[in-house]
């Protein structure tokens, strides 16, 4: 059935979009729960434990973002091949992204396990002995989970590329149930503290990885990868994947390196500031869930539209997705502003000073996010889905070093600013990114990109 909006059959009618988006929103909520559960349960050990976990998680996020970027490259190539009605090439791309992610994650895990102390000292410098002790314990077990995270990200991205977001949602549900149950037993039952939280996360990620890989090799899977032979390196396909994956990986990597630089700056403000920053980061992540989910859906929707040669539909669905992202941002942030911020902060075992810092940050986050978060982070996924990853990389790197890093160091070291000034630098970064991505989208040059 043709729609009056298009000259051809719509690729994603309302029911298909809802079926794609709702599981992604649920998956994002479940994913964020792992970080919240760890921080909440570890907070019972004290601020030093929260700080140690927070510092390591900032590095973990760097690794996870790079692996997610590589998975994004595979998802874009696979989505465009699906839209172009080339199932054989789509399956081949699926196998290659598993090869790329498994190789990368094992290599990174080996480096971190061998050099975790030097990495922590190099990034964060001189921190309290208790914080360092907790951080080293958490870092070791986190590194062991990297291969599971990499393969899980690859498998989940491939299911989303097919338009099947229920699989990644269900595997995320399993991961969270195991993680929270493990936290309860190991932290409260056996008194293992930070080590218990890290072990629970490791086991939960391994199980989620096993579930996704099992489903990916089942006969009914459209992107079935049923043997190690299928994962033999294919230079041509790897180059196509990396054409999106490398710029996205550099972008995400540099973005997280910038955040690590700022975390290093935050660590000079004292344990209360580190703890407040950790809690604010964890709680505000919940507010981005709808817009993040829309960004993930955009890789599938826009990728398949452009693979099918339907530029008109790509533009239409992009606008529709952005409207959805903004609606989600307004609902979440206004709800937090009026009802949830103070309650969320009270859940953590923070000093009065740290609580006050966290509340100030969260209020400003609510206000700024209403206007620029979706265009800063959801919109670039639309451009990446077209293969326009170099532009998003360039804008993100320039903006991050100029505002998120440059402004923050200037504000703190030269003008004596505190934790709030660091977050203000981040908001300036969002505004600049939003403007650049909006202009790129409006001019339409992203529609001329292709990765197949």
Label the model's feature ranges:
Residues 50-110, 149-168, 274-340, 373-396:
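Small-residue-rich hydrophobic transmembrane alpha-helices
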Residues 47-58, 135, 139, 198, ...:
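Small-residue hotspots at the loop-to-helix junctions and early N-terminal turns
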Residues 29-51, 120-129, 185-192, 253-286, ...:
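Helix-terminus/linker motif at the lipid-water interface of multi-pass membrane proteins
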Residues 71, 141-160, 168-176, 197-212, ...:
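Short runs within selected transmembrane alpha-helices of multi-pass transporters and secretion channels
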Residues 62-65, 179-183, 209-213, 286-289, ...:
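Hydrophobic transmembrane alpha-helices of multi-pass small-molecule transporters
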Residues 19-35, 141, 175, 204-208, ...:
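Transmembrane helical elements of multi-pass membrane transporters/channels
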Residues 1-24, 78-145, 189-246, 302-369, ...:
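Short alpha-helical transmembrane segments in multi-pass integral membrane proteins
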Residues 14-33, 37, 59-66, 144, ...:
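Residue-level signal for short hydrophobic patches within transmembrane helices
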């Amino acid at each position: 059935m043709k729609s009056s909006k298009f000259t051809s059959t719509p690729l994603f009618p309302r029911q298909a979009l809802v079926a794609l988006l709702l599981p992604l929103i649920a998956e994002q909520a479940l994913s964020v729960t792992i970080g919240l559960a760890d921080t909440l349960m570890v907070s019972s050990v004290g601020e030093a434990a929260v700080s140690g976990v927070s510092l390591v998680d900032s590095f973990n996020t760097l690794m996870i973002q790079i692996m997610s970027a590589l998975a994004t490259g595979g998802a874009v190539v696979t989505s465009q091949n699906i839209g172009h009605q080339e199932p054989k090439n789509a399956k081949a791309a699926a196998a290659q992204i598993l090869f790329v992610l498994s190789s990368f994650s094992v290599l990174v895990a080996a480096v971190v396990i061998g050099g975790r102390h030097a990495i922590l000292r190099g990034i964060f410098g001189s921190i309290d002995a208790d914080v360092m002790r907790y951080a080293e314990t958490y870092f070791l077990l986190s590194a062991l989970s990297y291969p599971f995270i990499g393969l899980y990200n690859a498998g989940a991205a491939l299911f989303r590329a097919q338009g099947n977001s229920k699989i990644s949602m269900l595997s995320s549900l399993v991961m969270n149930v195991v993680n929270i149950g493990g936290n309860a037993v190991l932290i409260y039952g056996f008194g293992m503290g930070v080590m218990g939280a890290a072990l629970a996360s490791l086991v939960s990620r391994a199980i989620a990885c096993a579930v996704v890989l099992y489903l990916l090799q089942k006969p009914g899977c459209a992107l079935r990868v049923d043997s190690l032979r299928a994962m033999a390196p294919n230079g041509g396909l790897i180059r196509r994947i990396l054409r999106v994956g490398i710029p996205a990986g550099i972008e995400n990597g540099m973005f997280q390196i910038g955040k690590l630089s700022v975390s290093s700056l935050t660590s000079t403000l004292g344990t209360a500031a580190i703890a407040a920053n950790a809690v604010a980061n964890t709680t505000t992540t919940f507010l981005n869930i709808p817009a993040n989910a829309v960004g993930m859906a955009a890789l599938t929707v826009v990728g398949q539209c452009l693979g099918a040669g339907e530029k008109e539909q790509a533009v239409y669905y992009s606008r529709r997705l952005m409207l959805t992202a903004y609606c989600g941002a307004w609902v979440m942030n206004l709800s937090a502003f009026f009802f949830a911020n103070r309650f969320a902060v009270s859940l953590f075992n923070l000093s009065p000073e740290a609580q006050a810092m966290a509340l100030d940050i969260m209020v400003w986050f609510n206000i700024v996010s209403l206007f620029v978060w979706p265009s800063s982070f959801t919109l670039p996924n639309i451009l990446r889905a077209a293969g326009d990853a170099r532009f998003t990389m360039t804008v993100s790197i320039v903006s991050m070093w100029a505002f998120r890093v440059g402004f923050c160091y200037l504000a703190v070291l030269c003008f004596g600013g505190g934790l709030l000034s660091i977050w203000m630098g981040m908001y300036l970064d969002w505004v600049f990114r939003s403007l650049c991505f909006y202009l790129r989208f409006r001019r339409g040059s992203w529609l001329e990109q292709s990765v197949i």
